[in-house]
Amino acid sequence: MALLPDKEKLLRNFLRCANWEEKYLYIIELGQRLPELRAEDRSPQNSIQGCQSQVWIVMRQNAQGIIELQGDSDAAIVKGLIAVVFILYDQMTPQDIVNFDVRPWFEKMALTQHLTPSRSQGLEAMIRAIRAKAAALS
């Protein structure tokens, strides 16, 4: 995830945006920084239900017990939201992910109040899926 900022830099960059158009463009830019997802990872088992767009999230645990996330979407803004979620969960163990509450970060960014209801539901579906997979690993 070297191409993506850490949590604090994400928040600083987001708060520097002058308006919501700039914030949306920043979110889209973050999505463009995600590594390409392999074709074989675009499978039903990695598909996230509850998203209006197609979303795939792959979760692997490395030898140190840290979760490595990869993902993609067919919608640019959703791909950016995937990147935001991955930044928040970066370098965490399964138990860290289960215990970590992303909502305060979204509140600091005022993110969910500026998303359409379907995008907010999709974001929640992504977080639920990641937390459920992490709980199964912890």
UniProtKB/Swiss-Prot annotation:
Biological process per Gene Ontology, one example term: iron-sulfur cluster assembly
Residues annotated as the enzyme's active site: 51
Pfam family, one: SufE
Annotated localization: Cytoplasm
InterPro entries: Cysteine_desulfuration_SufE, Fe-S_metab-assoc_dom
Pathway stated in the Swiss-Prot or TrEMBL entry: Cofactor biosynthesis; iron-sulfur cluster biosynthesis
GO cellular component: cytoplasm
Keyword field: Cytoplasm
Superkingdom assignment: Bacteria
Family annotation (SUPFAM superfamilies): SufE/NifU
Role according to the record: Participates in cysteine desulfuration mediated by SufS. Cysteine desulfuration mobilizes sulfur from L-cysteine to yield L-alanine and constitutes an essential step in sulfur metabolism for biosynthesis of a variety of sulfur-containing biomolecules. Functions as a sulfur acceptor for SufS, by mediating the direct transfer of the sulfur atom from the S-sulfanylcysteine of SufS, an intermediate product of cysteine desulfuration process.
Subunit structure, interactors included: Homodimer. Interacts with SufS.
Protein family membership: Belongs to the SufE family.
Cross-referenced NCBIfam families: PRK09296.1
Name of protein: Cysteine desulfuration protein SufE
Organism listed in the record: Escherichia coli O139:H28 (strain E24377A / ETEC)
